[in-house]
Structure formats: structure tokens, C-alpha cells
Amino acid sequence: MSTWANLGLQDSASPLMEQLIFFHDHALLILVMITVLVGYLMFMLFFNNYVNRFLLHGQLIEMIWTILPAIILLFIALPSLRLLYLLDEINEPSVTLKSIGHQWYWSYEYSDFNNIEFDSYMIPTNELMTDGFRLLDVDNRVVLPMNSQIRILVTAADVIHSWTVPALGVKVDGTPGRLNQTNFFINRPGLFYGQCSEICGANHSFMPIVIESVPVNYFIKWISSNNS
């Protein structure tokens, strides 16, 4: 989760989020290089004493400033397209989770198992434990197995919501009457926090998401205890 004075992205907990961070750093490096080059050229333009009143065109420089940006755009576009297709790919899931957005809480259904569904509300500040996180903790966490392909189906019951967990690189809009899906792979145990990322009304800020990633054997025990 994000902490105080955190200037970077959250630590990744999935392979796709790791790739997104690499692409962010790659694009940022290119932007810094462009900024330095343009800044240097502007400095040299403003602070030199050379003026040529008869220079009408420069074919070589025009070719350079046409071809060079095209090459730079290719270096950004190709990794971006690769990531776009990777994020859109749905692998054979081990577990399917359905998330339904409401004003202002989430409902969850484990589609592969019988009778496992619950609502997840934010814990109010006056009911929060001393080790809890204000405006982020919920009464019912989503329990998912680590090192397994997870598919999530997202929809909404009233207005548009957005199910977002930054550490997993997941952001899916929940639209009434429509079912959106994506998949992710959690590669370590822990708690991962997210929030609704689509303005959905007065209490939009108060519908957090908490995922508890556990080993597969603990997940099976949790499923068995909730099925009985």
C-alpha cells in the first residue's frame, strides 16, 4: 500500500504490475532524455551570438527532427502494445471471483463454490482497531490463493464503479448491466489495499477493497469453513 512520502509506485505483487513498473521507468527515461535535449537546444538558441538572416530552410535538420521522433515513438509504442495485449489476455483461471459495486460498498461471490457470498463495508474510524488503517480496512476481506490464476468479473448494481488494486495492476470498471473481466496472479502473501476509482456519489471515498493473499492450503481451509 502507499505510505507517507512515497514518491514511486506501490511494490508489485503480480508479474503484470512488475512489467507495468518497468514500462513506466522505460518511458520516464526517454522523457528525461527528451527534456534535457530540448532544454539544451533552447539554452543554446537564446544565449548565442550567431544570427543568419538568409537561412530559409535546412533539409538535413528537418529530416532529423522528423525521423528521430518517429524512432522514439516506436521505442515507446512497441512495449506499450505488448503490455496491452498481456493485460487483456485471460488464462485458464483457478478461481473466479465476482465483484458487484454498490453505493457505497462491494459485494463478492465465489462462483466456483456454493453459498459463498458476502458484502464488504469500510470499518468506520470509531470502530477501527489500533493497528487498522483509516478509510482502508473492511469488515470482510477478499481471501484469494497466491500463485494461482484469478479471474475477476466486475459489474455494478446502481452507478458506474471501478474495482482497483494498484499493487496487482488491476483496474476494472463496474458498469450496470454489463460484465467486465480481467485476470491477475498474486505472487506473494499479504494484504493488498485498493479503492473505488470512479466517482460514484457522496461516499465514493468510503468503499475500499482489501485482498488477503494466502497459500493454497489455507484458502482451501477457508473455503471449507465458509461452505459448512
Curated annotation (Swiss-Prot):
Changing residue 39 to S: In strain: Mysore. GO terms for molecular function: copper ion binding; cytochrome-c oxidase activity. Cu cation A2 binds at residues 196, 198, 200, 204. GO terms for cellular component: mitochondrial inner membrane; respiratory chain complex IV. It comes from Drosophila melanogaster (Fruit fly). The chain crosses the membrane at residues 27-48, 63-82. It is an enzyme of class 7 (translocase). PANTHER family: CYTOCHROME C OXIDASE SUBUNIT 2 (PTHR22888:SF9), CYTOCHROME C OXIDASE, SUBUNIT II (PTHR22888). Residues 1-26, 83-228 are mitochondrial intermembrane. This is Cytochrome c oxidase subunit 2. Component of the cytochrome c oxidase (complex IV, CIV), a multisubunit enzyme composed of a catalytic core of 3 subunits and several supernumerary subunits. The complex exists as a monomer or a dimer and forms supercomplexes (SCs) in the inner mitochondrial membrane with ubiquinol-cytochrome c oxidoreductase (cytochrome b-c1 complex, complex III, CIII). It is a multi-pass membrane protein. Mg(2+) binds at residue 198. Keywords: Copper, Electron transport, Magnesium, Membrane, Metal-binding, Mitochondrion, Mitochondrion inner membrane, Respiratory chain, Translocase, Transmembrane, Transmembrane helix, Transport. InterPro entries: CcO_II, CcO_II-like_C, CcO_II_C, Copper_CuA, Cupredoxin, Cyt_c_oxidase_su2, Cyt_c_oxidase_su2_TM_dom, Cyt_c_oxidase_su2_TM_sf. It holds the Pfam family COX2. Cu cation A1 binds at residues 161, 196, 200, 207. Belongs to the cytochrome c oxidase subunit 2 family. It is found in: Mitochondrion inner membrane. Gene3D superfamilies: 1.10.287.90, Cupredoxins - blue copper proteins. Binds a dinuclear copper A center per subunit. It comes from the Eukaryota. Coiled coil: none annotated. GO terms for biological process: ATP synthesis coupled electron transport; mitochondrial electron transport, cytochrome c to oxygen.
